[in-house]
């Protein structure tokens, strides 16, 4: 899969060892120019510098994706750097935390989970859609198996509800942007094998590899998936 000449924006890719690092490398290895976005400036610069050291095309941008003005400014910077043409947006920003039983939960945690998992996605999509229309590009969002029917979600009210709302947002975008040629899809991966997850959940948990997730993201952003939109793809 050749992606030379394409510009790809990836959010939430600052932390070393996480899936975003592998997804970004997969795009860059195939010739794409990647714009890495995270609120942690030093971390996202480290990820970008590693790609640059390998002779790949990368730029690091820091932004608070929960702030509408900051996201609009981010999109403007990318617009200026790409002549207004972005081919793919991969939104990995988010976070997981148990909120406990509903009757005992903290409303502040509910708000926090919706902010990091839903509001950031909405604001990022809103800001970058004009740039994606120019290329009939693709958007990929990271959902969760916790948002799917039959999932075991006890103690996860805030997280599961936020991710469920995210999947609905993806449906809305897919329907609204169909005529413009912009595609929107979501992944619902199983637990991803990272050092942090293994430490938290143990080595015997059934994991999906970061590389397997990256391959699905690449496909959804490629011309091979040009007729696929509004879908939730499970990765196990």
Language-model segments: residues:
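Canonical Rossmann dinucleotide-binding motif of NAD(H)/NADP(H)-dependent dehydrogenases/reductases
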Residues: 2-35
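Catalytic loop of short-chain dehydrogenase/reductase
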Residues: 12, 138-165, 170-179, 191, ...
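The beta1-alpha1 cofactor-binding region of Rossmann-like NAD(H)/NADP(H)-dependent oxidoreductases
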Residues: 42, 62-74, 107
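Conserved NAD(P)H cofactor-binding loop of Rossmann-fold oxidoreductase domains
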Residues: 92-99
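Substrate-binding pocket helix/loop in short-chain dehydrogenase/reductase
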Residues: 100-102, 109-111
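A short, exposed helix-loop element centered on a Lys and neighboring polar residues
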Residues: 125-126, 171
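C-terminal helical subdomain
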Residues: 179-182, 186-187, 202-236
């Amino acid at each position: 899969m050749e992606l030379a000449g394409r510009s790809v924006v990836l959010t939430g890719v600052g932390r070393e060892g996480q899936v975003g690092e592998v997804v970004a490398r997969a795009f860059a290895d195939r010739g794409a120019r990647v714009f890495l976005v995270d609120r942690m400036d030093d971390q996202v610069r480290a990820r970008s510098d590693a790609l640059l050291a390998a002779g790949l095309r990368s730029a690091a941008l820091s932004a608070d994706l929960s702030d509408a003005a900051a996201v609009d400014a981010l999109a403007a910077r990318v617009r200026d750097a790409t002549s207004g043409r972005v081919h793919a947006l991969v939104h990995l920003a988010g976070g997981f935390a148990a909120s406990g039983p509903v009757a005992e939960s903290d409303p502040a945690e509910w708000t926090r989970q919706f902010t990091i998992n839903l509001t950031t996605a909405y604001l990022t999509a809103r800001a970058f859609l004009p740039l994606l229309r120019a290329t009939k590009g693709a958007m990929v969002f990271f959902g969760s198996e916790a948002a799917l029917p039959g999932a075991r979600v006890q103690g996860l009210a805030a997280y599961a509800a936020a991710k469920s709302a995210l999947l609905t947002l993806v449906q809305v975008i897919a329907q609204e942007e169909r005529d413009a040629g912009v595609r929107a899809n979501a992944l619902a991966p199983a637990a991803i094998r990272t050092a942090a997850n293994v430490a938290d959940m143990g080595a015997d948990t059934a994991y999906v590899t970061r590389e397997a997730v990256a391959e699905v993201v690449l496909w959804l952003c490629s011309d091979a998936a040009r007729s696929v939109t509004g879908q939730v793809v499970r990765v196990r």
